[in-house]
Amino acid sequence: MILKDLLIEGYGVLKKASIGSYQIDAQLLLGKVLKKDRLFILTNPDYHIKEEEKEKYFQLIDLRKNKMPIKYILGTTEFMGLNFNIKKGVLIPRPDTEILVETVLEEIKNKNYKQICDVCCGSGIIGITIGYTLNNTEIICYDIEDIPYNTTKENILKHNLQDRVKALKSDLLTEAIKEKRRFDLIVSNPPYIREDVIETLMDDVKKYEPFEALCGGKDGLFFYEGIIKQSLEVLNDGGTIAFEIGYDQKIQVSHILNEYGFKDVLCIKDLAGKDRVIKARKY
């Protein structure tokens, strides 16, 4: 069988399954099987496909047909121009999180912060992007779950950042408190979706992405309060705390920050004009 014919079959299966991105997904999956980039797939229609390659391709097509996210199948994703390993068990990075990273990068540069903490780090994209961009920082990425912890370690090695980025296991900031660490900036994209909203999410999210990385408790605020409360013991005076938030959580998260004595609370909107990032300072 030639590449063009196999690709057309893949298109048909995914289109029938109502996968909106059926063409690009089929191309990327074939590229994964052949270990070729998408340009090769698009410019070599007569390339001969072996039987075992065909079988492997349709195994992957079947996963996508059943709504497994394409990035889990590929095992990689891009974030702010960097490539990261991801797998089932870690949240798939969203473009919205780039607003958070851009905000904290500016904060770190403006205030000459050195000691940075990424809590609920998932695949490590926030801490690693900071470390990759700013080589005069020291970053600790915390997560309590094995898969995120190990994935973050893989991504640190992938970008050769072992000298300034570390992954450690911790329930929020518990280990940082035990070890009496101090940070200039704490950043987090914690689970923040309300429990009752999870069931309304798209199939590829609620069926495959980890519940514990999505659900922020009954009101969506559980992790914000936990991190903010613990941060008082490890965040330096004059330090900054920054979060990604849900579009409707500005008032509640601002209230928690104020309750714990944080000042200069500022909310930043995303490109769609929705509240997306909140930051505040400890005095």
Swiss-Prot record:
Protein's name in the database: Release factor glutamine methyltransferase
Keyword Transferase: yes
Function of the molecule: Methylates the class 1 translation termination release factors RF1/PrfA and RF2/PrfB on the glutamine residue of the universally conserved GGQ motif.
Catalytic activity: L-glutaminyl-[peptide chain release factor] + S-adenosyl-L-methionine = N(5)-methyl-L-glutaminyl-[peptide chain release factor] + S-adenosyl-L-homocysteine + H(+)
Entries under Pfam families matching the protein: MTS (PF05175), PrmC_N (PF17827)
SUPFAM superfamilies: S-adenosyl-L-methionine-dependent methyltransferases (SSF53335)
UniProt record, GO biological process: methylation; translational termination
Keywords: Methyltransferase, S-adenosyl-L-methionine, Transferase
Family per similarity comment: Belongs to the protein N5-glutamine methyltransferase family. PrmC subfamily.
Keyword Cell division: no
Source organism superkingdom: Bacteria
GO function terms (MF aspect): nucleic acid binding; protein-(glutamine-N5) methyltransferase activity; protein-glutamine N-methyltransferase activity
Gene (name only): prmC
Positions of S-adenosyl-L-methionine binding: D143, N189
E.C. no: 2.1.1.297
Chain positions recorded as substrate binding sites: N189, P190, P191, Y192
Enzyme class: transferase
